[in-house]
Amino acid sequence: MGSNMSFSRSEAAPAAPLPDLAATLAAPRDDAFQQLGAAFVTRLPAAPLPAPYVVGFSDDAARMLGLEPALRDAPGFAELFCGNPTRDWPQASLPYASVYSGHQFGVWAGQLGDGRALTIGELAHDGRRYELQLKGAGRTPYSRMGDGRAVLRSSIREFLCSEAMHHLGIPTTRALAVIGSDQPVVREEIETSAVVTRVAQSFVRFGHFEHFFANDRPEQLRALADHVIERFYPACRDADDPYLALLAEATRRTAELVAQWQAVGFCHGVMNTDNMSILGLTIDYGPFGFIDAFDAKHVCNHSDTQGRYAYRMQPRIAHWNCFCLAQALLPLIGLHRDAPSEDARAERAVEDAHAVLGRFPEQFGPALERAIRAKLGLALEREGDAALANQLLEIMDASHADFTLTFRHLARVSKHDARGDAPVRDLFIDRDAFDRWANLYRARLSEEARDDASRAAAMNRVNPKYVLRNHLAETAIRRAKEKDFSEVERLAAVLRRPFDEQPEHDAYAALPPDWASTLEVSCSS
């Protein structure tokens, strides 16, 4: 899992030379996304952020980029990573915003784009290249009616969850830093500005492909697909149909990603096609949430009044989004094969795309079943395992048992008797229903060769004790608004080791307080 995250100021290593870092970020690369041209990106400087200061910093993300954690103490760090100019940039090296389109809440929304994010360049380390993007860096041509700013509240949430998801083992964009400022911005109330530095190998979304398809720009569509294949899916180059292979890989990664979400009780909140990564990463942390009291119909986004993106709907929506990606790729599928006519090529492309999309359930289902089987401590595969898991989820739903603690405490259940049942049993309103299920579970455990201790250790490696519950984030945010960033640092450090006991931090694993039920997050989050 890498080295421990630390937010203490480092005395051991010298601060990184920021001018060299800035120059490296700005250096153009022939195969970088921005080299695709003006149809894809608009270059512009970030809007200056007055008197910036560091709110949070991830040592772990810094090391991934080949940077020393001492970088956060370098003079000018906050200025560089909020987008304030540190030098006179030539036009060819300016940050850029990209254009894309997409479906929002199932409706075609037309042109969207990076409305408040600017990509400032790339860093390479350990054979991988990463794009760095500043979210909240000011207005762009794609801001629509927005002011281009992010607020401290949402930036802290994205920072914490990006890193938490990584340490849960779930593919995600990363977050290097949060930079704050006292500059006021108007949302439901007056808040202050912030910028979060997001990191990913690519920020290309399904919506990028939809944009060029919808605007009938086949050359740009093909250039985009070729870029993604060349940089991120090189095995697709040798396929009989590289573009069909791209669709297949993106669909598979999406199915497996959502299975991982479901396994930890994560709700994204706004699974629009412009929020879907072509690399199968969790991207765009807004009104997300980890389920506390289990409810399969749980909706974490207060703006989602119809429940389109409810927990139970996420697999179906992900599949639907892959259909949107497939539609955008249809003009490319089959171009490498001989066809008697364009109509014949197009007809075959539809058939091939449907075949790829038809595999989504058989990719998602087994991925989730494997994850749940591991969460239940079942090393062997048996025919009734899915039914056993579904019965557990049903009684959890009926009792609104805490999702994270239920699976964590199941490790204490013995295959021999009920003496270890109490911690998990106490989470259920209907104790009789739990007892009936526990007897079935014990019977199933008796078929396993592992002893209780070995099974419990394995379960604790996949069932986190700590997740980013909304009330934990809210506490850190409230303190940060008072310029006390210690809780952001402390919470991030706890979430860095989600599977470890960390008994000194038991309070972070407790059931949410009553006031947590009043918290709401929405698209403005």
Swiss-Prot record:
Q: Which keywords does UniProt give here? A: ATP-binding, Magnesium, Manganese, Metal-binding, Nucleotide-binding, Nucleotidyltransferase, Transferase
Q: What class of enzyme is it?
A: transferase
- InterPro entries linked: SelO
Q: What is its EC number?
A: 2.7.7.-, 2.7.7.108
- The keyword Transferase is annotated on this UniProt entry: yes
- The residues listed in the UniProt record as binding ATP, with positions renumbered to this chain, are 113, 115-116, 135, 147-148, 198, 205, 284
What is annotated as the active site? Answer: 274 (proton acceptor)
Residue positions annotated to bind Mg(2+) are: 275, 284
Catalyzed reactions per annotation: L-seryl-[protein] + ATP = 3-O-(5'-adenylyl)-L-seryl-[protein] + diphosphate; L-threonyl-[protein] + ATP = 3-O-(5'-adenylyl)-L-threonyl-[protein] + diphosphate; L-tyrosyl-[protein] + ATP = O-(5'-adenylyl)-L-tyrosyl-[protein] + diphosphate; L-histidyl-[protein] + UTP = N(tele)-(5'-uridylyl)-L-histidyl-[protein] + diphosphate
Swiss-Prot/TrEMBL cofactor(s): Mg(2+); Mn(2+)
Example of a GO MF term: ATP binding
The Swiss-Prot or TrEMBL record describes its family as follows: Belongs to the SELO family.
Q: Which PANTHER family match?
A: PROTEIN ADENYLYLTRANSFERASE SELO, MITOCHONDRIAL
The protein's job, in short, is: Nucleotidyltransferase involved in the post-translational modification of proteins. It can catalyze the addition of adenosine monophosphate (AMP) or uridine monophosphate (UMP) to a protein, resulting in modifications known as AMPylation and UMPylation.
Name by which UniProt lists this protein: Protein nucleotidyltransferase YdiU
Give the organism's phylogenetic lineage: Bacteria, Pseudomonadati, Pseudomonadota, Betaproteobacteria, Burkholderiales
